[in-house]
């Protein structure tokens, strides 16, 4: 099982993988001949940030003092980090005191009622560990038969990486896998001592070579909105879009709502599945 701080949320590993994605030309540096590794060299990052090379090396090696906010902001600019990547950098370098070591496992009854009251489109509540905590009938009909699954099986990361039918259910499996790993990376940065999260990462690392490969990239992803396709044994491929909303009164629970374009085959498929759930 991975060590919490060194694998689940390694600042050094994160910095190394991020600088490998930035070329000298991206940041206005002149080419300097053949390079043994892609991306920026350590001394180039140090120069861009205004640090000594020695300090930056110690930062990547985990031997430096806690970096200031000014240093982290400069690193984020030099490495061209997105908002989610910048937030993850801060989580790794400056852990928040008093941050919860666990995520909420229970859904408020009123919030469950909200999910159940969404009649014509799939909706569910999940946490940042990818545990599905509540769902409506259409979500169970389209995505997975959640009522028939044991609680630990209602985890989308397990289903993506350990279910042999995952590539059939998710036509865009590569993107689904990458975004799932990115969500877990973000969660690990926020809560490196979450025992359930550490166990999940260990289980996926042992059971899935694809997960191990993606985990090593240190990719981070914040689930917000976008396209999503499912393949269903009865209605075939269903192309939807999803939107996520932070569940009120929670830190890490998301309401995810999937919608179909009006008049589309996907809308017809959802209508048919809805009829089946009411039959």
Where are these regions (language model features)?
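An N-terminal domain-cap segment
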Residues: 26-39, 99-110, 116-117
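Recognition helix of helix-turn-helix/homeodomain-like DNA-binding domains
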Residues: 32-36, 42-43, 49-66, 74-76
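Amphipathic, well-packed alpha-helical segments that form the structural scaffold of globular domains
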Residues: 16-23, 90, 94, 116, ...
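Short amphipathic recognition helices of helix-turn-helix/homeodomain-type DNA-binding modules
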Residues: 1-16, 67-110, 128
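Hydrophobic protein-protein interaction segments
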Residues: 109-127, 132-279
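A short, Lys/Arg-rich alpha-helix, primarily the initiator
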Residues: 1-40
């Amino acid at each position: 099982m991975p060590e919490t701080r060194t694998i689940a949320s390694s600042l050094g590993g994160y910095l190394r993988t991020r600088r490998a994605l930035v070329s000298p030309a991206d940041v206005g540096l002149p080419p300097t001949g053949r390079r043994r590794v892609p991306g920026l060299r350590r001394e180039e990052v140090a120069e861009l940030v205004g640090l000594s090379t020695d300090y930056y090396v110690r930062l990547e090696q985990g031997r430096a003092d806690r970096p200031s906010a000014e240093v982290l902001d400069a690193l984020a600019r030099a490495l061209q980090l997105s908002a989610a990547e910048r937030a993850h950098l801060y989580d790794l370098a400056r852990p928040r005191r008093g941050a919860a070591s666990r995520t909420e496992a229970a859904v408020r009854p009123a919030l469950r009622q909200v999910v159940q009251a969404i009649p014509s489109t799939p909706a569910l509540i999940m946490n940042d560990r990818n545990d599905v905590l509540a769902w409506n009938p259409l979500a169970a009909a389209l995505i997975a038969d959640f009522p028939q699954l044991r609680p630990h099986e209602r985890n989308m990361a397990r289903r993506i990486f350990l279910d042999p039918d995952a590539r059939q259910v998710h036509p865009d499996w590569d993107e689904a896998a990458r975004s799932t790993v990115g969500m877990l990376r973000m969660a690990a940065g926020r809560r490196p001592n979450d025992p359930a999260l550490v166990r999940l990462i260990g289980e996926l690392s042992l059971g899935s070579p694809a997960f191990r490969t993606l985990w090593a990239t240190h990719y981070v992803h914040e689930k917000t909105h976008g396209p999503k396709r499912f393949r269903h044994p009865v209605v075939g491929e269903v192309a939807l879009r999803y939107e996520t909303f932070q569940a009120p009164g929670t830190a890490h629970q998301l309401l995810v709502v999937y919608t179909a374009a009006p008049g589309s085959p996907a809308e017809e498929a959802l209508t048919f599945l809805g009829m089946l759930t009411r039959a």
